[in-house]
């Protein structure tokens, strides 16, 4: 009975609209911040907006995130911005990290994009505040 309940509760996640699941590979990420591999799920999508939750990982760190992605121009080459809040846990530090990103997204196919841009991040770890500007580049796969 427990297995049936588990299957029935997970099944709607896979029966939803396409393009809600995103997997990102590359150096950092616009949605998940300090990550080489990231996963985001779009809670709500419109033609030019995406509201997401997700997580990413580096070799020894983890990032959980939630935010909003807005497309200014959506075509084969799209310009967009992302505002997100992230919780970062790493061997050397942990804390909250508000993040703003601007980027270009080039559609290689219907489900594959190349992303390049920059992000401004502020790390709040309780005892200090650090800010920085970082580039990101990567591949995004939508499912």
Where are these regions (language model features)?
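Short glycine/proline- and aromatic-enriched beta-strand/turn motifs that initiate or cap beta-hairpins
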Residues: 15-60, 142
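N-terminal hydrophobic targeting signals that begin at the initiator methionine
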Residues: 1-2, 17
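Short glycine/proline-enriched turn or capping motifs at secondary-structure junctions
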Residues: 3, 126-136, 141
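Residues on the lipid-exposed face of transmembrane beta-strands in outer-membrane beta-barrel proteins
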Residues: 27, 37-43, 66-70, 83-87, ...
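Outer-envelope beta-barrel architecture signal
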Residues: 17-23, 35, 47-51, 75-81, ...
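Sequence/structural signature of outer-membrane beta-barrel proteins
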Residues: 28-32, 44-48, 56-62, 73-75, ...
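Residues that define the transmembrane beta-barrel architecture of outer-membrane proteins
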Residues: 19-21, 31-37, 58-64, 77, ...
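Sec-dependent N-terminal signal peptides
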Residues: 3-13
